[in-house]
Amino acid sequence: MSILDTIVEQKKREVAMLPARVIAAGDLRDAMLERGERRDFIAALCQPGSRSAAVPAAGSGGVPPRETSPTGTAGKPAGGTPAPHPPIALIAEVKKASPSAGVICKDFDPVRIAREYEAAGASCLSVLTDEKFFQGSLDYLRQIRAAVRLPLLRKDFIIDERQILEAIEWGADAILLIVAILSDEQLKKFHSLATEAGLAALVEVHDEAELERAMKISPLLIGVNNRNLKTFKVDLVTTERLAARLKSRAGFQPALDRQDARPTLLVAESGIHTRTDVERLKQCGAKAVLVGESLMRGGDIGTKVRELIG
């Protein structure tokens, strides 16, 4: 049994202890309305460097805005010259430990770390909520939300719709959906429930087969995990290979069955340690990078963030 299988089995035991109930889209929308604020995760990725703004709770999960210059002309600054290549967005991870690395940060203060990430220019935050394997907590979402203005991703192993409700109630603006642990039916259902409620969904893949499954639901966010969750081997070529596959099949253009002009955004995850790594991933089409361990081990978080994204 792989570590991923072990984690999922533990997650099934945890989910079995949650109050039994059927979760409908209306329940999630009501929970979001009761919370009263949604931070636009996807818009924040489309505007790296800008400050997050709250939007009405009844939103649609984030609509990437049209990129404009100070003159208001998309893609061109004053004078009509081409705009420079847009900066890459950083999803900075609040992460104490992992099965592969053990304890990463002994002096772990989630609020302090989140504030340092925000001050250094992160676009969004990823918050580990798995307790047994990553020493995370749902309460970290609540604490961090009260301390910063950035949109928050609940980083966990979602296998049940009740976990989506938890994400809303504890303060997340986005959830992670790992294709490797979900059936096609679950993936479609959870993605639909989340987006209808106003949560962004980062749909994570690791290989071509998972990418093809993911693209059937026309996600706004595709995360490519460079770490094989079964072997824990890391290789940035994974993002390059799947980015090429995305370009060949869709060219990052809107899916034909989606009734709007929103493209799929590529997020590269894991194994990202240097500015060279970031530039390499940016060149192959990544709009954002999700980085945790190298930032948590970097000593001065602010300095490390600036080294990565400039």
Regions found by a protein language model. Name each.
Residues S2-P48, P86-C105:
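An N-cap/entry alpha-helix motif that binds or orients negatively charged groups
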Residues V94-D109, P151-I159, L202-E204, V267-A268:
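Active-site mouth loops of central-metabolism enzymes
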Residues L242-R245, R297-G310:
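C-terminal helical cap(s) of enzyme catalytic domains, especially alpha/beta-barrels
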Residues I159-W170, E208-I217, I272-V289:
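Catalytic cores of alpha/beta
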Residues E166-L182, V224-T231, A286-K304:
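Glycine-rich phosphate-binding active-site loops on the catalytic face of alpha/beta enzymes
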Residues C46-P87, K247-T264:
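Intrinsic disorder/low-complexity segments
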